[in-house]
Amino acid sequence: MDIENDLLCFFNFRSPYAYIGIKKTIDLGLKPVFLPFCYVPKEILEAVTLNNPYKKDYLLEDCKRLFDEEKINLVDEIPADCNWPKVHAAWHIINENNLDLGLTFMLKAFESRFQKGLNIGNKDTIITICNDIGFDSELAINAMEDVEIDNYLKSLTKIMRELKVFGVPTLVYKRERFWGQDRIPYLKSLI
């Protein structure tokens, strides 16, 4: 990964905005280096208002509009949070073995969460996705407990701080940040 020249895409399986952003990125033919945003720098966590019910209601309304625009069915109730680093660890081992399968797993994980309402932190869901894409599910499940992979995911907070990434999807090209799925067409015009 070359943070000076590669197109980087920070994502998290928790975010419906990341799902829409990644879909738009792929639809426009962009090929970013995907980086999980599953360990969030402390200073960002302290600044986030997690419990604002009005904001949560608005975000769900907004996501529904965006999903409708993309002709994607959004479940009525998005599953509760899970241990996000573990899910991203499963993705990481698949992506490290095969970039195409990593992308396929990513899209199926988003689909499972936002279209089917499944808990993607559940190992049975991970196993099903792996079986669907032809990847050894045992490797993915073992990755969820792998200390080295977890340390790698934690190390990404250094890059997030350096590039001032604060949410997903964030795409970074030549150190210029593009936050949000609506910035992707403009980014495409620059590349």
Predicted feature residues:
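C-terminal cap of thioredoxin/glutaredoxin-like
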Residues: 2-30, 108-191
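Structural alpha/beta surface segment adjacent to cysteine/selenocysteine redox centers
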Residues: 17-113
